[in-house]
Amino acid sequence: MISWWTAKEKNGQATLYSSNITLNKVASVPFEFANRVQVGLDENNNIVIEPLSKERVERGDLDEYNLLEIKIKPSYSRICSTDLMNFIGEKLKLALSTEPLRFETVWEEENNHLVILIKK
């Protein structure tokens, strides 16, 4: 029996730097129509990114200072915030710099967010 490779089997990947989170194309797909994102940490110390539509942002019930822009490019997307990366580095005890730290990602359909799996 032949097991054919398909693009759907590719893994999403996030790369962390001192100034941004970069998502590969696979991890970026759920964010193609996002206006902004919220980023946080879950109880397992994984990074959680939730896409927010323009309608959700304009409802006014979210603190605009906690919403971040996501830049979508043809082969990747990027969330830039030195403050965010300092927070993540401190909380997760990660040495973030110009050298990349790469982690696998998982899209959680039921929660409508992307999880960056931080394994130590």
Please report, for each region that a protein language model flagged, where it lies by residue.
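Mature exported/compartmentalized surface modules and terminal targeting/interaction regions
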Residues: 1-2, 7-10, 41-44, 48-120
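N-terminal leader/targeting helix
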Residues: 1-28
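Beta-strand elements of modular eukaryotic interaction domains
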Residues: 12, 28, 37-38, 104
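Short, surface-exposed loop/turn motifs at beta-strand boundaries within globular domains
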Residues: 14-16, 32-34, 42, 109
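Short beta-strand-centered segments at strand-helix junctions
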Residues: 18-32, 77-87
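Long compositionally biased, domain-poor regions of proteins
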Residues: 20-26, 32-33, 37-40, 48-52
